[in-house]
Amino acid sequence: MLLRLTRMVVIRALRDEDVPAVSALCLAAYATAGHFDANDAYAASVRDVAGRRGHGDLLIAEEDGVIVGAVMLCSSDSEYAEVSRADEMEFRFLAVDPQRWGQGIGESLVMACEEQAHACGIPAMTICVIDINAAAHRFYERLGYSRLPERDWQPRPGVNLLGFQKALD
């Protein structure tokens, strides 16, 4: 008989001591995905985990004491909210260690956001994804998100963000 041991990923709130590791992880994930080079202005925003504190819930995925993913969950009145409305929440800055892509960590973080929003009585989750990230579009559609074209927007010329939404039943 073959026994298979699997590692357990724990989703928990960000702690002060996590900030440097999460900043590096976010920067690496977004750069590896081709969203910017390390000197891009958006890189500073992605890297600024400390600046996001107090503007939403920062969750991390940890495995065997190593941070392998992170996400920010924010309400519609957060300065970080981009497309959510009063009865919605959204998550931002989803990042997974590039060496761990495809292992369910991103899905676990998204599910944690959805569960937290649902527990607060929020009926829907919204997100926006850059138009050139077809892999992310497929990922979110697989998780039950649908396009919300009326929420598409451009933070700056040439950067097209597509709105997505999921009902939290």
Identify the function of each model-found stretch.
Residues M1-P20, D169:
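Conserved N-terminal entry element of GNAT/NAT acetyltransferase domains
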Residues R12, R92, T126:
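Rossmann-like NAD(H)/NADP(H) cofactor-binding core
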Residues D16-Q99, V110-M111, Q116, A167-L168:
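Acetyl-CoA-dependent GNAT
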Residues L25-A28, R47, L58-L59, D87-M89, ...:
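C-terminal "cap" of GNAT-fold acetyltransferases
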Residues D97-Q99, Q103, D131-I132:
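Active-site acidic-Proline motif in GNAT/NAT acetyltransferases
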Residues G104, S108:
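Short alpha-helical segment within the catalytic ATP-binding CA
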Residues V110, A117-C128:
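Conserved GNAT acetyl-CoA-binding A-motif
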